[in-house]
Regions:
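N-terminal extracellular ligand-recognition/capping segment immediately after the signal peptide
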Residues: 27-34, 44-73
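Predominantly extracellular beta-rich ligand-binding scaffolds that present long acidic/polar faces
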Residues: 55-64, 103-106, 117-124, 128, ...
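Right-handed parallel beta-helix/beta-spiral solenoid domain characteristic of secreted/periplasmic
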Residues: 63-118, 374-377
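Surface beta-loop-beta hairpin patches that serve as ligand-binding interfaces in beta-rich domains
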Residues: 393-430
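Surface-exposed interfaces of beta-sheet-rich extracellular modules
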Residues: 405, 462-491
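Conserved "repeat-terminator" motif of extracellular CCP/Sushi domains
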Residues: 426-436, 490-511
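C-terminal outer-membrane/trafficking sorting elements
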Residues: 511-550
Length: 550
């Protein structure tokens, strides 16, 4: 009877080989939701109304399930449909690897509690969401999942045992927070995390502690993600790379390890960290010999080479004290390793300082290191966690564009506007349109503009000053930014801080009573033009006309 009821509610297409859309209303139980999924076939979609559904849920291959639907299934809101395990077992799992991409989206997935080992789809995965190949969660809030047995719970929020990290996105546009696991408090993945926020997770369970408070990459990828405020019960507060992994265009900030490595730990095999901002992480290990491992620790031992490029590593700490050296780098295959196009924290006048093993074959190059010596990154508001760039930053345009593997930054701004910036954020540029003007020279900063119309790229937040020098016989009538008139102070106009595309309009007027001299003098005597008379100027003749005679 339940199945008949569900299909009566939700079958939007004729009972045929065509895909069906099945609607589940909020008065139904978690058991009935699972029955609707079990009764669907590959290609069908299940739409779930906003509400709370208790239980343990299993994906079915080829059946996409989405939550957040309103009363008449015409609009959708993220996180309004809640899947709650009520602290008893895993919330959502994929029973085996799929060959058809299967997506669950727009859910809150919460209150899982793994109490014993589960081998589905792989042994010891998450209490929140456990995924294999071709399984994906999207636009989901995954929170408050934990474990209560002395065994593995790899990835408290999301555990993934995908095969191909390059093509398998296991979680996209998700918030993964307040979860507890053993290898990655937030997530443990072999696939790809894309556009996710992983925050306030831990591997500090009293039952069993583990490494990687935020993310454990088991040969996986993390692209355009934020990893912040996580706590490790062992080593690596932010992200641990085990196996050949990649961290691309991501922010790793404010994480803490009770052991060593506050930010990123690369172990077991070489990995790539490209275009990332790794800041303000802390390690609490007692052994001072690990001080330099506060930002990035590279213990790579493979001849594939670890690549650290286009990053900013700044302000990472040991027991709350910012360390002079921010990156620890050791390799048995030194010639294959590179650290370049990076700015790291320095407390001395010796420039950028790295802790490296004493091997003359190691290669470290830093573009313009002398110019960068002693210069801070100029973040927007680091005290409040805003590590976006300001226009004063020495990181602007310093990255190697050939290594910039994404076209958008962490905010979705285009990369490579005026060169690629170091770190995860690109400073936006706006257009200052200078409306057509004549009879004056405009100077903005060190750039001069004569008569004409111009489009000038301006960095966000930049406050430009301008001077205007009218030609002889002319003066400034008005200066406006869009519709707002500007007033000069001691001859200098201050343009408002750039936050949008704007138009600068300069109106120049001819002075009354001012002579306009031409290059050739008229040999004829000056004539007085009386009221009512017409003066005709013919080709080939030039005159000196005094304004007082007009």
């Amino acid at each position: 009877m339940k199945k008949i009821f569900f299909y009566a509610l939700g079958l939007m297409c004729a009972l045929s080989a065509q895909a069906a859309v099945i609607q589940v209303t909020s008065d139904k139980s978690g058991t009935e939701l699972q029955e609707a999924i079990n009764g669907a076939k590959s290609g069908d979609s299940v739409l779930v109304q906003a509400g709370t559904y208790y239980g343990n849920f299993t994906m079915k291959e080829g059946v996409n399930v989405s939550g957040g639907w309103n009363e008449d299934f015409t609009a959708q809101t993220d996180y309004e449909t809640i899947l709650d395990a009520n602290a008893d077992g895993r919330v959502l799992e994929q029973p085996s690897n799929f060959t058809t991409l299967t997506v669950w989206s727009n859910f809150t997935i919460q209150n899982g509690n793994l109490k014993a080992i589960r081998s589905v789809p792989a042994s010891g995965l998450s209490s929140g969401v456990a995924l294999g190949k071709k399984g994906q969660v999207k636009h989901c809030l995954i929170q408050n999942n934990t474990f209560s047995y002395n065994g593995n719970c790899m990835g408290g929020g999301v555990g993934n045992d995908s095969i191909d990290a390059a093509t398998d996105v296991c979680a996209e546009d998700c918030i993964i927070r307040n979860n507890c696991g053993t290898h990655g408090g937030g997530a443990r993945v072999r696939g790809t995390l894309l556009n996710c926020v992983i925050e306030n997770n831990n591997t500090n369970n009293s039952v069993k502690k583990g490494p990687a408070g935020g993310v454990h990459l088991q040969g996986g990828r993390m692209v355009n993600c934020i990893v912040r405020g996580n706590l490790s019960g062992g080593d690596t507060g932010g992200v641990r790379c085990w196996g050949k992994s990649q961290i691309i265009n991501s922010l790793i900030a404010g994480n803490t390890a009770t052991g060593k490595v506050g930010g990123v730990g690369i172990e077991n095999a070489n990995s790539d960290i490209i275009g990332c901002t790794i800041v303000n992480n802390d390690q609490l290990v007692n052994d001072a010999s690990h001080n330099s491992k506060c930002g990035i620790s590279c213990g790579a031992t493979s001849d594939n080479g670890t690549k650290l490029a286009n990053n900013v590593v700044w302000g990472n700490k040991h027991k709350g004290v910012v360390q002079e050296a921010q990156v620890y780098y050791i390799s048995h295959y030194a010639a294959a390793n590179r650290i370049y196009n990076a700015i790291t924290h320095q407390n001395t006048t010796n420039g950028i300082k790295l802790s490296m093993n004493n091997d003359e074959n190691d290669t470290y190059t830093d573009n313009d290191s002398n110019e960068q010596t002693g210069r801070a990154p100029h973040f927007a508001d680091p005290a409040n966690g805003d590590y976006r760039l300001t226009w004063q930053s020495p990181m602007l345009g310093r990255a190697d564009s050939s290594i910039a593997v994404v076209t958008k930054d962490l905010d979705g701004n285009n990369r490579n506007i005026e060169g690629v910036d170091l770190g995860a954020y690109e400073l936006p540029y706006y257009t200052l349109t200078i409306a057509a003007f004549d009879h004056a020279t405009l100077t903005i900063g060190e750039d001069a503009y004569t008569a004409g119309e111009y489009s000038v790229p301006m960095p966000k937040g930049y406050t430009a000053t301008a001077t205007i020098a009218p030609a002889e016989g002319y003066s400034i009538k008005s200066v406006k930014i869009d519709e707002d008139e500007l007033e000069a102070v001691a001859g200098v106009y201050t343009l408002p801080a750039v936050s949008a595309n704007v138009t600068l309009t300069i109106e120049i007027q001819q002075d009354k009573g001012t002579a306009i001299d031409n290059t050739k003098a008229n040999t004829k005597a000056a004539k007085q033009i009386r009221n009512g008379q017409l003066l005709i100027l013919r080709d080939g003749k030039e005159f000196n006309v005094l304004g007082s005679q007009l």
